[in-house]
């Protein structure tokens, strides 16, 4: 897999995958971006916007009419204005990155004719109305809200539609299965239809009291006969001499037990003797022999049900009603009336049960009105129903599009499940839908059909950002609608404009609330690029309208066969959220209905084509799918005759003939998520450890020097590019200018004359991420380099040459070492600390605000009372710390004084005041100090001033610096623009016939390069040529040039204006200062480290290099791991990685030798030969020139990087071959010597290179100590936790331990003076100050709290102090 990219030529990965990938992996943050773009639709397409997203919300709420229908407010269109601040400015100022929404509304006022009631339009007014700000998504799929980056996580919820289920026999003691159906709309009332233990069918609306389902059908407008004819067939029994003639149908009579002989009605022959059962086969044979009808006696009619009302045609008297059961008595009566034909219901109690007929019989309501009243009473208990109110309420429950919405998805699901064909624009229920649900449910009870599996991904869908936001905005607009209606009715409608009717606060508040406090709007995990990408691809079943942790059972959390290729079976958190929070698989995408789809290659007649089809779980159910690693011949035909497939219908693995296979997986890694796809040899790891491995990669801290893994999977480049950590070129071009903070590229391709030919890429330097890790980008290119579109031009945090690099490759030895690696501890070499291998930079942010208080304004100043000059040495004259100052815990960062309340003065004080004048005692020092445990360097200071407050020196200096930077940007861009435009102009004019030109140009002479360069550039535009086309092009170019120039200047002025304008600060704040401290964290004992295979541990000791075990060539191991950590955990992938990494490093050494040979003999042949042996015939390497080849070899010297994709990677034989190529022992083991004694260890040791990560759990953030500190207000016990500077809890079990030792005095002081005996605490302190060590324990405050609680219950508790008691025993009482 040759990557012909700029970085791909600098370091080539050897690829071990065998399977050719046909499908392109979709962009990894597509889920977020596509969804939100569809919601906003910023640019209005020609012909107007489609009815979706924001447009759909406005369409559904508008038009709004007033109560009397005399006026109407219509929605016309909406548009966005440009955002006030760009993303970076919002981050710095703590603003939300949002664009103002402008909506055009039309107010129509009607005249109403009093006699006819006809409306005529009286007045129409249109106006643009501001409707609040809508947050915009950044390039990387995040939102900036109040200055912090947030991610909206997609939610998995139950798809709208109809679901059939049973109670698994748990409701009733007999264990009978009670079936139920539930119609779930997107919004609106739920409809449940269920059986009870007596097989009567009931309906419930919104989980309220149940009503017989026939009442619901009455309310829908059916009568008893129609209900029966809907659910049952009608059979005509005809009277003949010997009994009744019945048409014979094999399906109906199968399983029929005879009481009397069965007799053919036409021939009179006995078909089946009495007492026998008619089998299915026998029934079919009889039908084939031509049996038309049977003769049944009177007694066999008894127990059947009538299908129609039997009416006397003359008198209109009803003898029997439809659904009535025939008894001997009623049959006798019917015979007497002389009925020759009886229409009966086709109910045999075997294939067709009498459930609906029994429900009809049990139902007390007989008419539509009764049924509507009954439903009204259930929905609104206590209100007396009228026929109109009952009808309106029933209509609005399921048939009103305002109140009920199935959504397109729900309609599609209903159609599929019930085999209906309603269009997906019909979003409410229909009568047919409800009847079809009841029919299907009754069919289930009769044993036809299957119940639904609610964990099937066809029944769960994803709500992404756009949809969640749409629902939220709709809520806001509906709140607004009420206010508008009231206002329209109360004001004089002829004089107002739309603006006066609208208050956009509710809409804006709904959006703000959603982004600020919704459970699905989360603070982005920005530890490293992988954690960002994973966070954006997360699917959560929690959140509003979803599950809760407590209620979610095992089934919901479990892996389901339909997850294959859609949701990762590995990556999910450990703990209470396991299985509720999932990750999207690598190739998965979400379709327009919100179902997760995965790509497959189509197979035709035993041959696999390159056509890629995306299938959802429902569609996949119809096909059989082969795996990606099926053997194919070069033409793409299956080699085997029988192929192992997943059968969609049964969801089992089956063997299928090659020509019957429908689809094949596109890639072996399509079933796992991004994080899991980054683990090499994932297939050799136990699932539990793979889960830990994928979760821990997200916690890896970006290191000072990133290094890509020797053993990768080929996904590293994709993640680095899609996460936005590494910068990719937007257009093909040449590097024009470069420094640490920006890259300027002159575009050479797709030069649109209307666009600037220059791209400027700003790099982020030492920015703080959400998790306080350091974001720093550095360029990979130099001036004059050619880059293509999409090439990586700068590395970000945790990326190396455009590949994700979360950790470092270190030399590992698997052996015990003096017990220091017992139980997953890790032993490190001092080299790792000395060479800064695992050193990371963390940036802490501290802020201080100067507020306006009641006693006067706070002041940021250097003049602080009672502070030595030494403590102020790092502050400038404004009282703010210098950039570059080294600070440690307790140092002042920003000096601040706060006025304090006047306390009454003593006469002595008054005298001193009078003599020495005003003293600075009326202020107290509230400076910002460095908190404990932090030590570092100041890297940035930002000062924010309220509008109208004078800026101090420091703020002005920062502003001047920023303006200089902006001016430099403008000038550079201008210079490149000039060079570009005038270069193109000269090329166009050169060697043309000139008919005009600047002053002094001879007419009708040739324009040569020399002639052009005589004149200043600004006059070049004056040249003219007879070619009209050329002149038009030059004119267009000039127009574009002037516009660009103007645009540049305008942008510069806008930015300067923003800088000089005051900042928007919270109310009461005059000034705010933010200080950023960079902390360098070297690795130390107590830090957590991990590999990629779930092999985690804590550093136990850092050993001098000379004491570490070493190899025969004198190389010392960097890290020693315990071999016992492997067998029981079954993550063998780490061992394979170790061997392969060992081979990579060995091959790197070989390449290093060829570099040395080149410097001696100036011959590159041995190098090319060595690379050919390693890589085979690699196109990229063949295409390199000598200089590029040398650069490649230098990059490969530490180790040759390889890619071993998941489920398709290097096999044992490949690893052995690599080891042999490197000239190493194929066993992967080496003789190792003890660094302390120099002796060899008794056995050979597995040694190799493993990729280790340093995780975000650093001991510096966790270690904590307290002497005195804050106490809880009520109990007076010390607070807990590091954040509160709390103490260590001495809990119940610890008390038991001291009791067990009989350490009474220690225990007493733990429970009193060291905790909540307030008086005792101060006494102890005084005693210590005096150098004394006697103290007395008093009564703990918590005892008083207990007494007060008992008193509050009305129990008076008194302490009686007996004369004999010692003070300690009194406390014990």
From Swiss-Prot:
Q: Which UniProt keywords apply?
A: DNA-directed RNA polymerase, Nucleotidyltransferase, Transcription, Transferase
EC number(s) given by UniProt: 2.7.7.6
Checking Gene3D superfamilies in the record gives: 2.40.50.100, 2.40.50.150, 3.90.1100.10, DNA-directed RNA polymerase, beta subunit, external 1 domain (2.30.150.10), DNA-directed RNA polymerase, subunit 2, domain 6 (2.40.270.10), RNA polymerase alpha subunit dimerisation domain (3.90.1800.10), RNA polymerase Rpb2, domain 2 (3.90.1110.10)
GO molecular-function annotation terms? DNA binding; DNA-directed RNA polymerase activity; ribonucleoside binding
Q: Which domain of life is it from?
A: Bacteria
Q: Listed GO cellular component terms? A: DNA-directed RNA polymerase complex
BP GO annotations: DNA-templated transcription
The answer on whether this UniProt entry bears the keyword Transcription reads yes
Q: What catalytic activity is recorded? A: RNA(n) + a ribonucleoside 5'-triphosphate = RNA(n+1) + diphosphate
InterPro entries, per the entry? DNA-dir_RNA_pol_bsu_ext_1_sf, DNA-dir_RNA_pol_bsu_external_1, DNA-dir_RNA_pol_su2, DNA-dir_RNAP_su2_dom, DNA-dir_RNAP_su2_hyb_sf, RNA_pol_bsu_bac, RNA_pol_bsu_CS, RNA_pol_bsu_protrusion
Q: Which SUPFAM superfamilies match?
A: beta and beta-prime subunits of DNA dependent RNA-polymerase
- Role summary: DNA-dependent RNA polymerase catalyzes the transcription of DNA into RNA using the four ribonucleoside triphosphates as substrates.
Its subunit composition reads: The RNAP catalytic core consists of 2 alpha, 1 beta, 1 beta' and 1 omega subunit. When a sigma factor is associated with the core the holoenzyme is formed, which can initiate transcription.
The family note in this entry says: Belongs to the RNA polymerase beta chain family.
According to UniProt, the name of this protein is DNA-directed RNA polymerase subunit beta
List the source organism: Rhodopseudomonas palustris (strain BisB18)
């Amino acid at each position: 897999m040759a990557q012909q990219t700029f970085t791909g030529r600098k370091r080539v990965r050897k690829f071990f995958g065998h399977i050719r990938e046909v499908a392109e992996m979709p962009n990894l943050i597509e889920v977020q971006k596509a969804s939100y773009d569809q919601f906003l639709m910023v640019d209005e397409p020609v012909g107007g916007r489609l009815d979706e997203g924001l447009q759909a919300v406005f369409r559904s709420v508008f038009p709004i009419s007033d109560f009397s229908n005399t006026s109407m407010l219509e929605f016309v269109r909406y548009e966005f204005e440009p955002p006030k601040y760009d993303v970076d400015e919002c981050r710095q100022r703590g603003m939300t990155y949002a664009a103002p929404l402008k909506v055009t509304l039309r107010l129509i006022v009607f005249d109403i004719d009093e006699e006819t009631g006809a409306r005529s339009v009286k007045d129409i007014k249109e106006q643009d109305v501001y409707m609040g700000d809508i947050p915009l998504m950044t390039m990387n799929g995040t939102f900036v809200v109040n200055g912090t980056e947030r991610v909206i996580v997609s939610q998995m919820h139950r798809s709208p539609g109809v679901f059939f289920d049973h109670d698994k026999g748990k409701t009733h003691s007999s264990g009978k299965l009670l079936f139920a159906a539930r119609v779930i709309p997107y919004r609106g009332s739920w409809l449940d239809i269920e059986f009870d233990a007596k097989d009567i069918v009931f309906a419930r609306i919104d989980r309220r009291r149940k009503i017989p389902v026939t009442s619901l059908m009455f309310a829908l407008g059916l009568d008893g006969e129609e209900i029966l004819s809907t659910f049952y067939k009608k059979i005509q029994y005809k009277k003949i001499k010997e009994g009744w003639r019945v048409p014979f149908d094999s399906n109906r009579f199968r399983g029929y037990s005879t009481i009397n002989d069965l007799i053919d009605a036409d021939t009179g022959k006995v078909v089946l003797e009495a007492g026998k059962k008619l089998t299915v086969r026998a029934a079919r044979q009889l039908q084939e022999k031509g049996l038309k009808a049977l003769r049944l006696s009177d007694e066999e009619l008894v127990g059947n049900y009538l299908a129609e009302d039997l009416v006397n045609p003359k008198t209109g008297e009803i003898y029997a009603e439809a659904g009535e059961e025939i008894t001997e008595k009623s049959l006798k009566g019917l015979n007497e009336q002389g009925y020759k034909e009886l229409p009966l219901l086709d109910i045999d109690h075997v294939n067709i049960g009498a459930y609906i007929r029994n429900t009809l019989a049990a139902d007390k309501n007989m008419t539509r009105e009764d049924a509507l009243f009954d439903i009204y009473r259930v929905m609104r208990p206590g209100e007396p129903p009228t026929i109109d109110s009952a009808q309106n309420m029933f209509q609005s429950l399921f048939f009103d599009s305002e109140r009920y919405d199935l959504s397109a998805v729900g309609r599609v699901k209903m159609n599929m499940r019930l085999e209906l064909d309603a269009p997906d624009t019909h979003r409410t229920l229909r009568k047919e839908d409800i009847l079809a649900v009841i029919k299907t449910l009754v069919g289930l009870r009769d044993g036809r059909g299957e119940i639904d599996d609610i964990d099937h991904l066809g029944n769960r869908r994803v709500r992404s950002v756009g949809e969640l936001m749409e629902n939220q905005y709709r809520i806001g607009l509906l709140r607004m609608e009420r206010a508008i209606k009231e206002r329209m009715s109360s004001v004089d409608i002829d004089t107002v404009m739309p603006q006066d009717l609208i208050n956009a606060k509710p809409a804006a508040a709904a959006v703000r609330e959603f982004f600020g406090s919704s459970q699905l709007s989360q603070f982005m995990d920005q530890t490293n690029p992988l954690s960002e990408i994973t966070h954006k691809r997360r699917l959560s079943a929690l959140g509003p309208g979803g599950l809760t942790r407590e209620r979610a059972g095992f089934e919901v959390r479990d892996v389901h066969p339909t997850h294959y290729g859609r949701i990762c079976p590995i990556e999910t958190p450990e703990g209470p959220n396991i299985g509720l929070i999932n990750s999207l698989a690598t190739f998965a995408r979400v379709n327009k209905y919100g179902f997760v789809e995965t790509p497959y290659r189509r197979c035709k007649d035993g041959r696999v084509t390159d056509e890629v089809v995306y299938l959802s779980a429902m569609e996949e159910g119809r096909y059989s799918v082969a795996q990606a690693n099926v053997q194919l011949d070069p033409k793409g035909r299956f080699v085997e005759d029988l192929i192992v497939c997943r059968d969609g219908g049964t969801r089992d693995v089956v063997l299928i003939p090659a020509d019957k296979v429908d689809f094949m997986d596109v890639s072996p890694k399509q079933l796992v998520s991004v994080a899991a796809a980054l683990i090499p040899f994932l297939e050799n790891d136990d699932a539990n450890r793979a889960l830990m491995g994928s979760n821990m990669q997200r916690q890896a801290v970006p290191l000072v020097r990133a290094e890509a893994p020797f053993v990768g999977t080929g996904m590293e480049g994709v993640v680095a590019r899609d996460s936005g950590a590494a910068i990719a070129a937007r257009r093909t071009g040449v590097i024009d200018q470069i420094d640490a903070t920006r890259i300027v590229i002159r575009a050479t391709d797709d030069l649109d004359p209307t666009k600037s030919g220059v791209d400027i890429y700003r790099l982020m330097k030492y920015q703080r991420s959400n998790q306080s890790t350091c974001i720093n980008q550095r360029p990979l290119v130099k001036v004059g380099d050619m880059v293509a579109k999409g090439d990586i031009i700068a590395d970000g945090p945790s990326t190396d040459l455009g590949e994700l690099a979360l950790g470092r490759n270190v030399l590992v030895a698997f052996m015990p070492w003096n017990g220091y690696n017992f139980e997953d501890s890790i032993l490190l070499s001092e080299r790792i600390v000395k060479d800064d291998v695992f050193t990371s930079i963390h940036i802490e942010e501290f802020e201080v605000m100067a507020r306006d208080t009641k006693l006067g304004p706070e002041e940021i100043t250097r003049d602080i009372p009672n502070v030595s000059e030494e403590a102020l040495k790092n502050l400038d004259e404004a009282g703010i710390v210098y950039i570059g100052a080294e600070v440690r815990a307790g140092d002042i960062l920003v000096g601040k004084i706060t006025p304090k309340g006047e306390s009454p003065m003593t006469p002595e004080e008054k005298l001193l005041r009078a003599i020495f004048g005003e003293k600075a005692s009326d202020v107290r020092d509230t400076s910002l100090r460095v908190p404990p445990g932090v030590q570092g360097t100041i890297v940035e200071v930002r000062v924010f001033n309220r509008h109208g407050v004078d800026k101090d020196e420091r703020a002005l200096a920062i502003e001047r610096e920023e303006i200089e930077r902006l001016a430099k940007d403008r000038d550079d861009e201008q210079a490149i623009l000039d060079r570009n435009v005038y270069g193109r102009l000269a090329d166009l004019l050169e060697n043309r016939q000139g008919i005009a030109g600047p002053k002094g140009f001879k007419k009708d002479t040739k324009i040569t390069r020399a002639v052009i360069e005589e004149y200043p550039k600004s006059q070049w535009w004056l040249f003219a040529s007879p070619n009209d086309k050329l002149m038009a092009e030059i004119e267009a170019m000039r127009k574009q040039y002037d516009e660009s120039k103007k645009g540049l200047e305008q942008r510069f002025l806008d930015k300067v204006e923003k800088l000089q304008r005051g900042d928007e600060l919270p109310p009461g704040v005059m000034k705010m200062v933010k200080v950023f401290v960079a902390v360098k964290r070297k690795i130390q004992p107590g830090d957590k480290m991990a590999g990629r295979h779930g092999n985690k541990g804590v550093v136990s000791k850092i050993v001098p290099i000379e004491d570490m075990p070493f190899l025969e060539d004198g190389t010392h191991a960097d890290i020693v791991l315990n071999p016992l950590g492997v067998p029981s955990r079954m993550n063998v992938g780490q061992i394979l990685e170790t061997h392969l990494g060992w081979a990579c490093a060995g091959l790197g050494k070989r390449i290093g030798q060829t570099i040395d040979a080149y410097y001696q003999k100036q011959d590159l042949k041995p190098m090319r030969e060595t690379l050919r042996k390693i890589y085979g015939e690699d196109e990229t390497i063949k295409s390199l020139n000598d200089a590029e080849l040398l650069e490649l070899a230098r990059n490969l010297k530490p180790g040759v990087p390889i890619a071993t994709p998941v489920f398709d990677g290097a096999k044992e034989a490949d690893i052995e071959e690599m080891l042999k190529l490197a000239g190493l022992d194929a066993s992967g083991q080496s003789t190792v010597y003890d660094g302390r004694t120099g002796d060899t260890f008794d056995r050979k040791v597995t040694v190799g290179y493993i990729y280790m990560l340093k995780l975000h759990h650093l001991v510096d953030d966790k270690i904590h100590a307290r002497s005195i500190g804050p106490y809880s207000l009520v109990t007076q016990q010390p607070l807990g936790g590091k954040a509160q500077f709390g103490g260590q809890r001495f809990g119940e079990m610890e008390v038991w331990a001291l009791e067990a030792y009989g350490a009474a005095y220690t225990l007493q002081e733990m429970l009193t003076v060291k905790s909540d005996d307030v008086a005792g605490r101060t006494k102890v302190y005084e005693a210590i100050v005096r150098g004394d060590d006697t103290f007395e324990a008093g009564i703990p405050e918590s005892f008083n709290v207990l007494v007060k609680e008992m008193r509050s219950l009305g129990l008076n508790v008194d302490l009686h102090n007996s004369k004999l008691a010692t003070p300690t025993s009194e406390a014990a009482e």
